[in-house]
Amino acid sequence: MYSLEELKSFLKKRLSKKRFIHSLNVADEAYKLAGMYGEDPDKAYLAGLLHDVCKESPTAEQEELMLKSNMNISGAELSTKALWHGPAGAYFIKSELGINDSDILNAVRYHTIGRSGMSKLEEIIYMADLISDDRDYKDVDKMRKLAYSDFERAMYEACLLYTSPSPRDTERS
């Protein structure tokens, strides 16, 4: 297994500066949320750090990794390239980085789409991605406060945010 510093160095080379900073911000947010909500902060930090490991990979590579993963990929995911980096990233983390922790793999896998019955760690990564310091969409401050005061309500609001028919500037990355 790689050390945290080795993984940061790897990501710094692999990702754009903006995406690397975003990954660090998500990791920091996940660490804080995990501590508050009874999850392992170090595990949350690692999942947050790695959540976008394949976000900037070529589309063909993302598709190949996603299909190799043998994960249950929905038709909606297959038809939406912007979602491929979740399952591709989970497979990459397992096959290339040797991380086999199913909690981390699922948190990365579902960080863009969520799912019914998400674990607390999956929810934390989902939320950390939404409220990280680099986010600046309308009402992000409200979501940040809610995430630390009423996590279940924050998850509910997050689901509404992404299923609402009105366009919102929240770019999931």
Where are these regions (language model features)?
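Divalent metal-dependent catalytic cores for phosphoryl transfer on phosphate-bearing substrates
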Residues: 6-13, 31-159
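Non-catalytic interface/linker regions that flank or bridge core catalytic/transmembrane domains
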Residues: 1-2, 168
